[in-house]
């Protein structure tokens, strides 16, 4: 587990990158926040030691992209209908 200083530094340094990647892939603020928390939780619990800042940044990018893809492939995501689509449909009798 990482120290609070390491986590705060990583959040300060990579939060913008993680959020932007999420928004590009998910186009949804709520899902972006969920993945953001997931990525940084993985970082906190990870015991990976990084060779350099570039290696650490690459880890954040890869973990973020993978988490976004996992969410997009998930059963829950594939079985939901956005509310705005339901509002546009005529009522079924």
Task: Please place each PLM-identified region on the residue numbering.
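A short, charge-rich alpha-helical start-of-domain segment used by transcription regulators
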Residues: 1-20, 24, 33, 44
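Conserved catalytic core of Hanks-type protein kinase domains
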Residues: 13, 25, 62-63, 71
């Amino acid at each position: 587990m990482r120290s609070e200083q390491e986590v705060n530094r990583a959040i300060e340094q990579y939060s913008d990158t993680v959020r932007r990647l999420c928004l590009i892939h998910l186009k949804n603020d709520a899902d972006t926040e969920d993945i953001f928390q997931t990525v940084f939780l993985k970082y906190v619990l990870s015991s990976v030691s990084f060779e350099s800042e570039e290696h650490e940044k690459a880890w954040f990018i890869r973990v973020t992209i993978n988490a976004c893809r996992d969410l997009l492939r998930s059963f829950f995501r594939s079985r939901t209908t956005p509310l705005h689509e339901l509002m546009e449909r005529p009522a079924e009798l």
